[in-house]
């Protein structure tokens, strides 16, 4: 039975993270700590000999991915479908500013994967745009999981996207998506895609995904979730 390992790595810390400011798809840079976190995560994950590294185009994710690429000898490809959730009117606002402008709205957003800020995306929207990428990787990366290989495909992205994509791959009921909590900066998730015994090894529909690891890190420092 073929097993595909999928690692999803969140970017390192940004100043927006440190200041509890909502980024969404704003293109922010890693902080000094974030760059240290990216290197520490890269040193751990490079030992896994990634088969492929695909990154969001936003700088905080791409710079995190490049750190892994440099240490693993793998080029980094970019896919805009890995961008963070668009947060609409909330982008650039602090948590306190959002709470003052719309009391209770952040709680509703946390508790309902179908809910979106004005002008933004829900977690269901984010999963709908990112899930086809994994489908394509299963179809196109014929070496992924072949002959018992544990070499993972690594997606470097953002906490909101990783949670939404994980929930979708696991087939969780949408009402249960909020059980997947926040991730630390430069932390990662691992899923294993098991092809059914009677399934087609190249067919996405014949894969059952299992969660191996959630929110693992190299533990450079505590950070904002």
UniProtKB/Swiss-Prot annotation:
Domain of life: Bacteria
GO MF, one annotated term: phosphatase activity
Keyword Secreted listed: no
Family: Belongs to the phosphoglycerate mutase family.
Enzyme class (EC, first level): hydrolase
Name of the molecule in the record: Glucosyl-3-phosphoglycerate phosphatase
Enzyme active site: 11 (tele-phosphohistidine intermediate), 84 (proton donor/acceptor)
Catalytic activity: (2R)-2-O-(alpha-D-glucopyranosyl)-3-phospho-glycerate + H2O = (2R)-2-O-(alpha-D-glucopyranosyl)-glycerate + phosphate
């Amino acid at each position: 039975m073929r097993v595909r390992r999928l690692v999803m790595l969140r970017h390192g810390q940004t100043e927006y993270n440190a200041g509890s400011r909502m980024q969404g798809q704003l293109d922010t840079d890693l902080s000094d700590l974030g760059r240290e976190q990216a290197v520490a995560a890269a040193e751990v994950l490079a030992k896994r000999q990634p088969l492929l590294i695909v990154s969001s185009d936003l700088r905080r994710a791409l710079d995190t991915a490049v750190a892994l690429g440099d240490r693993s000898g793998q080029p980094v490809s970019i896919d805009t479908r890995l961008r963070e959730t668009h947060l609409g009117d909330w982008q650039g606002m602090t948590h306190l500013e959002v709470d003052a402008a719309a009391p209770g709205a952040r709680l509703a957003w946390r508790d309902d994967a179908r809910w979106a800020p004005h002008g933004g995306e829900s977690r269901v929207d984010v999963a709908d745009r990112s899930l086809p990428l994994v489908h394509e990787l299963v179809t196109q990366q014929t070496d992924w999981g072949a002959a018992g290989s544990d070499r993972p495909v690594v997606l470097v992205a953002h906490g909101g996207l990783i949670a939404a994509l994980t929930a979708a791959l696991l087939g969780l009921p949408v009402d249960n998506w909020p059980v997947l909590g926040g991730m630390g900066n430069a932390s990662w998730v691992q899923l294993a895609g098991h092809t059914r015994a009677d399934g087609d090894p190249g067919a996405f529909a014949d894969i059952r995904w299992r969660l191996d690891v959630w929110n693992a890190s190299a533990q450079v420092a505590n950070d904002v979730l």
